[in-house]
Amino acid sequence: MKQILDFIPLIIFFALYKMYDIYTATGALIIATAIQLVVTYALYKKVEKMQLITFIMVTVFGGMTIFLHDDNFIKWKVTIVYCVFAAGLIIAHILGKPVIKGMLGKEVTLPDDKWAKINHAWVLFFTVCAIANLYVAFEMPLDVWVNFKVFGLLGLTFLYTLFTGMYVYKHMPKEKKEEQE
C-alpha cells in the first residue's frame, strides 16, 4: 500500500501534463504530494525523511515554477533531490550511521562492508541519475524530459532496487537464505 502511495503524485503529474501543461501538472504534484504526506501519516503515524525532503523540494521548486512561470525550476528539483539523497548517504556513512542498513538491517543481516558497498552503490546511482536528469532536462524537449522523469528514472530506480536485492541475497548468511526459501 505504501509503495502505491509513493507513485500517485507522479502519476497525477504525468496525466495532467499530458492533458494540460507543465504548470497545471506541477500544481497538482504539489497538492498530491501534500495529500500523500497526510495520508501516509494517518495510516502509519510516521513520515519518512525522504518523503518530507521530496515534499519540501516539490513545494519550493514547484512553487517557483508556477510563480515565475519557468519550467526550469521543476526540472532542477529532480537533480537536487538526487544530490540531497546522495549527500545524505555520504554524510550518514561518514558519521557511522548507514541509512540503508538502518532501513533494511532489521530484516537482513549482512557484514558491514557489504552494507558500505550498497551505500556507495546508491550514492553512485543517485549521482548518475542527477547528471542524467540535467542532460535530459536541459538538452531535450520538455516532453522527453517528462517521459524520462516518469518512466526512465522510475524504471532505473526499480531495476537498481532489484539489483540491490540480488546483491543482498547473494551475500546473506546461508541460514537466512534458507529461512527465506
Swiss-Prot record:
Q: Where are the transmembrane segments?
A: 22-42, 50-70, 80-100, 122-142, 148-168
Name any GO cellular component annotation: plasma membrane
Record carries keyword Oxidoreductase:
no
Q: How the protein sits in the membrane?
A: Multi-pass membrane protein
InterPro entries hit by this protein = YciB
Pfam hit, one: IspA
Listed A to Z, the keywords are:
Cell inner membrane, Cell membrane, Membrane, Transmembrane, Transmembrane helix
Give the signal peptide range: none
Coarse class of the protein's main subcellular location: membrane
Task: Give the domain of life.
Answer: Bacteria
Give a yes or no for keyword Cell inner membrane in this entry.
yes
Q: Where in the cell is it found?
A: Cell inner membrane
Record's function text: Plays a role in cell envelope biogenesis, maintenance of cell envelope integrity and membrane homeostasis.
User: What family does this chain come from, according to its entry?
Assistant: Belongs to the YciB family.
> What protein does this entry describe?
Inner membrane-spanning protein YciB
